[in-house]
Amino acid sequence: MWKEFREFAMKGNVVDLAVGVIIGAAFGGIVSSMVADIIMPIVGAVTGGLDFSNYFLPLSESVNASNLSDAKKQGAVLAWGNFLTLTLNFLIVAFVLFMVIKGMNRLKRKDEAASAEPPKPTREEELLTEIRDLLKAKV
């Protein structure tokens, strides 16, 4: 049983998936930083210095805080600014993954086209070709 599990775990797909998950987690941190530290401040500057992460809609009258963390302590809020930031984060990740996959597919097609040379004829095919040529020569 251990041998079967080891063979399964060492197959290319499982190892590739594990590497992909680890790289994806690291990449997620980079994208989150890009959205929070680069894109959203630019969007905030264009819209007059607004910080979208603190945009919320209070769902009870007891909420009167000016920032999201204090408002959550006071009661229920709809944190639509945070949702907007996370949606932008997702769109950036999806676009980057799309571009990576598109590039990989392009390279794969080039490799397939380069290695698409016809296969070498088998010994049987060579013998049949010789027989055909001999028969043609007699006619």
UniProtKB/Swiss-Prot annotation:
Report if keyword Transmembrane is assigned. yes
Q: How does it sit in the membrane?
A: Multi-pass membrane protein
Q: Keyword Transmembrane, does the record have it? A: yes
Major location, coarse class? membrane
This protein's UniProt keywords: Cell inner membrane, Cell membrane, Ion channel, Ion transport, Membrane, Transmembrane, Transmembrane helix, Transport
> What is one cellular component GO term in this UniProt entry?
plasma membrane
Query: Where is it localised?
Result: Cell inner membrane
| Transmembrane annotation, as ranges | 19-39, 40-60, 81-101
What Pfam families does UniProt report for this protein, alphabetically?
MscL
Q: Which cysteine residues pair off into disulfide bonds?
A: none
GO MF annotations for this entry? mechanosensitive monoatomic ion channel activity
Q: Which InterPro entries match?
A: Mechanosensitive_channel_CS, MS_channel, MSC/AndL, MscL_channel
Q: What does this protein do?
A: Channel that opens in response to stretch forces in the membrane lipid bilayer. May participate in the regulation of osmotic pressure changes within the cell.
Subunit notes for this chain?
Homopentamer.
**NCBIfam families, per the entry:** mscL (TIGR00220), PRK00567.1-4 (NF001843), PRK13952.1 (NF010557)
What does the similarity note say? Belongs to the MscL family.
Q: What is this protein called?
A: Large-conductance mechanosensitive channel
Organism annotation: Nitrobacter winogradskyi (strain ATCC 25391 / DSM 10237 / CIP 104748 / NCIMB 11846 / Nb-255)
